[in-house]
Amino acid sequence: MDERIISSETVDAEEVSFETSLRPQTLSQYIGQDKVKNNLTVFIEAATLRNEALDHVLLYGPPGLGKTTLAMVIASEMGSEIKTTSGPAIERPGDLATILTSLEPGDVLFIDEIHRLSRAIEEILYPAMEDYCLDIVIGTGPTARSVRLDLPPFTLIGATTRAGLLSAPLRDRFGVIDHLEFYTEEQLTEIVLRTSGILDTKIDDLGAREIARRSRGTPRIANRLLKRVRDFAQVRGNGTVTEKLAKEALTLLQVDPRGLDTIDQKLLHTIIQSFRGGPVGLDTIAASIGEERETIEDMQEPYLLQIGFLQRTPRGRIATETAYNHLGISYEKEV
């Protein structure tokens, strides 16, 4: 399957390395998410003044909005070391126990995709989060006994794209729960200009805004599009990313003015032309366009809902009049 240039997931190790090189180090350098930043600034300063670990933090929202970056920034602001892992990587209770017992006082433990932890793993986390202790069972059968190990004060930062899949007991143990929202065009323009400076790429304000406009409210996509448009500027232009060049390059990359690609358009066309605009169930849509249900839920639907192209109802998904207009299809409202 071909790489989607507007996918909000990281594509490969090279892109992970690229993102790491762009990451801000402080909250003041972090662009966007102002409400989240303002609250975290207070919480971090208060914890520092009390010489305590920051409360456990849950960050949730669509992929590519900066959850991992924000976790790194929090650790940096606290002057703490950060250890990173992910839900799928913690397969056995012993895996988590090894990580927890390696923590030093004040460390930050970042668990990406925390919703994918098994219930058995979650149960080990409960006392670790609440009481900074770890209950382990030694032996088996009638001779088995439980031993409690003390852990140093630490901060757990969990990140998820699907907060609804977290169990209530785990969710309730986070003292700080923040939702990361899609970025505005102005914020993404600022991000594109910042990234172009790091990449030593010449770009004008209108060129940056054109890239931002097609970036689906997502910094990861904005940075990826900038890299590709930069290639066109060097090969087919004079090295400077202008509005005209950005439009031409993104059109060739099949990213339309609202940030939709051929897969998004296929989804909308299917709802409109095969199912009379809906409502139609997500499983039916997935089967019709050859995509996984989870891919549509995580990668396509949030943005299409955000820009008003889709509506989610108890009976299924509906394509809106705005979607019809964008695709140039006549909209006839049923009476």
From Swiss-Prot:
It comes from the Bacteria. GO terms for molecular function: ATP binding; ATP hydrolysis activity; four-way junction DNA binding; four-way junction helicase activity. Its EC number is 3.6.4.-. It catalyses: ATP + H2O = ADP + phosphate + H(+). Its main location: cytoplasm. It is found in: Cytoplasm. Residues 1-183 are annotated as: Large ATPase domain (RuvB-L). SMART domains: AAA. InterPro entries: AAA+_ATPase, AAA_lid_4, DNA_helicase_Holl-junc_RuvB, P-loop_NTPase, RuvB-like_N, RuvB_C, WH-like_DNA-bd_sf, WH_DNA-bd_sf. It is an enzyme of class 3 (hydrolase). Mg(2+) binds at T68. ATP binds at L22, R23, G64, K67, T68, T69, E130, D131, Y132, R173, Y183, R220. The keyword DNA-binding applies. Pfam families: AAA_lid_4, RuvB_C, RuvB_N. Keywords: ATP-binding, Cytoplasm, DNA damage, DNA recombination, DNA repair, DNA-binding, Hydrolase, Nucleotide-binding. Homohexamer. Forms an RuvA(8)-RuvB(12)-Holliday junction (HJ) complex. HJ DNA is sandwiched between 2 RuvA tetramers; dsDNA enters through RuvA and exits via RuvB. An RuvB hexamer assembles on each DNA strand where it exits the tetramer. Each RuvB hexamer is contacted by two RuvA subunits (via domain III) on 2 adjacent RuvB subunits; this complex drives branch migration. In the full resolvosome a probable DNA-RuvA(4)-RuvB(12)-RuvC(2) complex forms which resolves the HJ. Has 3 domains, the large (RuvB-L) and small ATPase (RuvB-S) domains and the C-terminal head (RuvB-H) domain. The head domain binds DNA, while the ATPase domains jointly bind ATP, ADP or are empty depending on the state of the subunit in the translocation cycle. During a single DNA translocation step the structure of each domain remains the same, but their relative positions change. The RuvA-RuvB-RuvC complex processes Holliday junction (HJ) DNA during genetic recombination and DNA repair, while the RuvA-RuvB complex plays an important role in the rescue of blocked DNA replication forks via replication fork reversal (RFR). RuvA specifically binds to HJ cruciform DNA, conferring on it an open structure. The RuvB hexamer acts as an ATP-dependent pump, pulling dsDNA into and through the RuvAB complex. RuvB forms 2 homohexamers on either side of HJ DNA bound by 1 or 2 RuvA tetramers; 4 subunits per hexamer contact DNA at a time. This is Holliday junction branch migration complex subunit RuvB. It comes from Listeria innocua serovar 6a (strain ATCC BAA-680 / CLIP 11262).
